[in-house]
Amino acid sequence: MRLNKYIAHTRHCTRREASRLLARGEIKVNNKVVKEESYRVMEGDEVTHLNKPLQEQIVYRYLLINKPKHFTTDIGDKDSKYIMGLIKKEDPTGLIAVDHMGPKSVGLLLLTTDKALVEKLNQKNRKVRRVYLIELNKDIEEKDIKKLLKDRKTLKIESASHVDGYKANYIGLEMTIGSENILKGVINRMGFEIQRIDRSYYAGLTKKDLKRGWIRPLQEMEERMMKHFI
């Protein structure tokens, strides 16, 4: 990493201010004065300002996207568009999706550089509240909806019902344990096919005021709320 960028990442000052410190000869690397902004800081190097150690602080990124249809989080899916293609103004370096969403899935998706958070969210039996609107290939009766609520080791559906204002082939569903792939498998074995699955809520986050295909960083309050819910 370039030295001026490293200094900025310690939150000691901005990158522009770091350039001034370097020009004044106030920065040392391994006890030697360095004035070049382009100097590469290597792992194990000690960087100091006026003999006070500067340590890089990891700043994680959290991006919320309202995913449109035909995009996928699977880079190996040759028949669909990779989700990172939507990120034009953001640096995709290190970003990963918190969970899998295929081409028929739309709605709320979180991208982050925080690998520990992703691992936590995907722990087996970790309860993470998610809300979906699901369009099926045919009408579904109440008796079949009740079958969805059956307890399973790999899937926990908290509620499922028809939705006011939608046809009988739509259901609203809330689950806390399991993946979309597991949910799709259960629905397929019941004789139905999912035409579209739209996620509106995930771990305290919503897609309110976020248009389809749009992306924005999480606000600090949203980040705290999300971590509170998990």
Spans of model-derived segments:
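Basic, flexible Lys/Arg- and Gly-enriched helix-loop patches that mediate nucleic-acid binding at interfaces
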Residues: 1-230
